Amino acid sequence: VLGGLGVAAVAGGGWALASVVGPERPVTMTPESSAHPAALDRSALRRRTAIGDARHVYEVDGRATPYYVQDAFAATLAAWMTTHRTLTGQRPDALHSYGGWTQGAGTSWHHSGQALDIARLRTGGADVASLRYDRWRDDTAAEVRRRLRTYWQVAAGLHLHFADVLTYLFDASHSNHIHVDSGRFGPGGVPRLIPRSGAQVQAIQAMCVHVWGRTGVQTSGELDGPTRDATTAILRDHGGTGELTDGVEAWQAFLRATIRQARDA
């Protein structure tokens, strides 16, 4: 599981920043998994009340509520929260979600305790990041720009730790939360860009537009010329090298630069 912004070797040469703090350690290029969700009973999962230092709150009723996920998935959530706190300077004391495990037949990673639907991050009773696109998408243009910048900052951090990150761009059912799961690379896998992943490509396109101001990029889900040109230029200008498709190192460098750009805007 990734924990901090240390440096790790990648199979095939080069180095990848695989964590937020911690020693250098080798990692391999995690292969994609062909696994499917396995339905688990809630009794097989541990009861949890927080993600890192942030208590878990059920978004529907605003009450502190336990959630249930597998141990490895919980560790990745905690690592992401460390990344978020370190790179943004925010100190969320509450994370609102629609829950982790849900009972089902194994058609969703929620059924195996390897997914969470994140709605808001809050500090002292106030939002520091709202992923409730459904609530603010019709606000003033200036307010929507501000919220989109923060939204995609959070999404960038999630993409550092999870390969499957579904936003309002995926479909309307995700307009009130960001969904994360560990299905593509399995628990503890190191995410990287999969060029055929429409969700990943749309995310980097939205980051280009809403964080970097690259308005010539379209959120098409296709890794087209304008997207490649914009992301390569961002990498070049902010300490990275190569292209996003080069592997873990470039992927992480782009995402970390995006988080910092949103923070400093």
Name the predicted role of every residue range:
Residues 1-5:
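N-terminal export leaders
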Residues 88-101, 130, 163-172, 217-220:
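Surface-exposed patches in mature extracellular/periplasmic domains of secreted proteins
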